[in-house]
């Protein structure tokens, strides 16, 4: 059974505070969009799909018992709150897509009564949870089939950051692929990176792997090339925060160098993400906004300094992996090469 990072029922939203993992499993109540914004910004919840879901559900929690005099008032309230949520972390596109989708949804309901509009909006948002899990299971299935079809099995996998149940509504994207391979009894071993400086790999991915008893080993970020050379890695799978039309992919810092190392060692490199992570407005990855975070994330651990005082710090949270380094992009609709992804997915959308 996978971890449950997001709990929602009848206007009550709780999230597993990922800042406290792996030492403490504590759920915190998110009462409104201000709580939601802070949870996203402070990385109590992280992972592009989870950011969008928690953002939307924080809106649901806020409007659940709040009265509105008119449907126009509700629509304007929703629009402003969604725009605010979208400022919490700019690189992940899933929240932007949720903002566009939900804003358009309420705009089409202005002829409804405020009560009916609210109920339809709540149903729409609440459906995002089950929809995300279904998408993740499809991603897991297609990714497992693609990797096993390409390299055979059993396989030894390498992954970066956290792309499992803690980064989504459940099951996961990149880790969902690994989970699917494990369920098929074709996983020999998985190596996960520590993922400095926030240690999502050592704190979160390792936590999930141990929780589910998946054979696994934690390695330093700087050990990936050595692991590829000596540990017989079959394939690499990572997640994505934003994918451009040509396949350029923004993901957790360190992904780019991982892809370069995989290319050198002739190891297939896969990106696993729902279609909501694809930004069809971007021709390539050059225009992706890269979030830069506090220097303290590099210079201290739990408030204790670990770097020389006065040293300059550059702390980008993401990098962009060029499409030419990516073997395939796994979505809920199948696995596509970066070159074919845009046309095939747009054809599916009709």
Curated annotation (Swiss-Prot):
Task of the protein: Catalyzes the interconversion of methylthioribose-1-phosphate (MTR-1-P) into methylthioribulose-1-phosphate (MTRu-1-P).
Superkingdom, taxonomy of origin: Eukaryota
GO molecular function ontology, one term from the record: S-methyl-5-thioribose-1-phosphate isomerase activity
Site residues, Transition state stabilizer: 161
Protein family according to the UniProt entry: Belongs to the eIF-2B alpha/beta/delta subunits family. MtnA subfamily.
PANTHER family: METHYLTHIORIBOSE-1-PHOSPHATE ISOMERASE
Active site residues according to the UniProt entry: 241 (proton donor)
Pathway annotation: Amino-acid biosynthesis; L-methionine biosynthesis via salvage pathway; L-methionine from S-methyl-5-thio-alpha-D-ribose 1-phosphate: step 1/6
GO annotation (BP), single: L-methionine salvage from methylthioadenosine
Localization: Cytoplasm; Nucleus
Enzyme class name: isomerase
Pfam families in the cross-refs: IF-2B (PF01008)
Predominant cellular place of this UniProt entry's protein: cytoplasm
GO terms for cellular component: cytoplasm; nucleus
Keyword field: Amino-acid biosynthesis, Cytoplasm, Isomerase, Methionine biosynthesis, Nucleus
Catalytic activity field: 5-(methylsulfanyl)-alpha-D-ribose 1-phosphate = 5-(methylsulfanyl)-D-ribulose 1-phosphate
Name of the protein in question: Methylthioribose-1-phosphate isomerase
Enzyme Commission identifier(s): 5.3.1.23
